[in-house]
Amino acid sequence: MANNKLAVIGGSGLYDVEEFTKREFLKIDTPWGKPSDEILKTNYNNKEVFFLPRHGRGHFISPSKINFKANIDALKQSGVTDIVSVSAVGSLKADLPPGKFVIIDQFIDRTFARNKTFFEDEIVAHVSMAHPTSNGLMDACEESIKKEKIDYQRGGTYVVMEGPQFSTLAESNLYRSWNADVIGMTNMPEAKLAREAEIRYASVSMVTDYDCWHPEHENVDVQQVIKVLLGNAAKAKNMIKNLIDNFEKHIDPKDPTNNCLDVAIITAPEKRTQKTKDKLKTVAGRVLKK
């Protein structure tokens, strides 16, 4: 399993860990443009790990403007096989209070201004998103969270909204009527693109607020989100260190993500131009070179 490499996508503070002493910042170009920022390559307990701040260092990229395709392509170029997303979310349920972690297993994609596929020009593919997260990585996340005695829930549906504005009360109540658990702005199309690139994906969401539906709590604002995130910072960093140590032992060699493109590409071989195959070399080269 020596070829498995973990990347964490999240806030820039997540890699501010004392033990990460050997650091290299990678500038990577992709056919889709530049990723959100330089990718940090570091080592922990002799294991290589990568960190990418999806909003850029200093949080200057709006959710709708994140270059998700470049981020995923750049991580794949770096040899990444597994991605764990760490993000702030609002709670849509009373039993998911601020401070609780949720290991996501489903998404409802409500975004509308983002490019959501690598396969949009001459080569068409339809990957399955029935189960958008990888069970093995979820197991690794759960073990890492338990070790820190963090209050958490395994399994939950994440509504991904376009943003950058927060929800209206009507929207928040609509999502609650769908029995969704949390709401945020960042995990789509990230999870879809990771699947298209055959990278295993898991999502750990940190609840920071009750959105705007709860009659006994203030409506969400940025200062409230930051306050809870800072309170969770030490726990999140320790969780990540645990993940680096344990994720490989949970990898499922039969994970459907590993070879999902084998049954996804529908375009006839004679219609696949070399120009497009070259563009997709990183994310789909395994199947397109056959």
Stretches found by the model and what they are:
Residues 1-131, 287-290:
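Metabolite-binding pocket within alpha/beta catalytic cores that recognizes anionic/polar moieties
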Residues 212-259:
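His/Asp/Glu-rich mid-to-C-terminal helical/loop segments that flank catalytic regions of hydrolases
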Residues 185-223:
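Zn-dependent metallopeptidase/amidohydrolase metal-coordination segment
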Residues 147-181:
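Active-site/ligand-binding-proximal alpha/beta "capping" segment
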Residues 76-79, 176, 195:
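Non-catalytic positions within long, well-ordered alpha-helices that form the structural scaffold/packing
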Residues 81-82, 181, 200:
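Short acidic/polar active-site loop segments enriched in Thr and Asp
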Residues 261-290:
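Acidic, Ser/Thr-rich low-complexity intrinsically disordered segments
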Residues 136, 140-151, 238-246:
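Generic non-transmembrane alpha-helical segments
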